[in-house]
Amino acid sequence: MRKVLLIEDDALLCWLLEKILKNKYDVTVKNDGEEAWSWLINENIPDLIVSDLKMPSLSGIELLENLSANDTLKSIPIIIHSGYEDAGKRKQCLDLGAFAYLVKPFEPEYLVSEVERAIESRNENILAK
């Protein structure tokens, strides 16, 4: 089963996103970016990260910056989600290597399709190497 790291500081939304994903994926939940980063640098390598943009302690953008600077972790696709449609933030996230930028609210099916697309893309990149 593919492993997904879900990073979300809103408890209700976190519960909902985990419920959507756990039928198809092994989901690990972290409630802020700092907690997630500590988990990642201890050699926990998920197939995908789904992260909120705006979080206490370490934002989604800071997480993207950390990932892109780490040779072991930079190949992990990350989907950023935000409650704000901000073209500048979207561009910044995509420029930093985010696979997708989703604006809340989004349909559960859309999230699942983006997760599947991101994991397939990672698998193709691994096979190409």
What are the functions of these language-model segments?
Residues 8:
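Conserved acidic carboxylate
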Residues 11-29, 35:
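Two-component/phosphorelay signaling modules centered on CheY-like receiver
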Residues 14, 56, 65, 86, ...:
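The feature encodes the CheY-like receiver
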Residues 29-48:
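Acidic, metal-coordinating helix/loop segments flanking the phosphotransfer/catalytic sites
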Residues 32-35, 59-65:
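Acidic catalytic/metal-coordinating carboxylates
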Residues 62, 85-100, 113:
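Alpha4 helix (beta4-alpha4-beta5 surface) of REC/receiver domains from two-component response regulators
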Residues 106-115:
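C-terminal output helix
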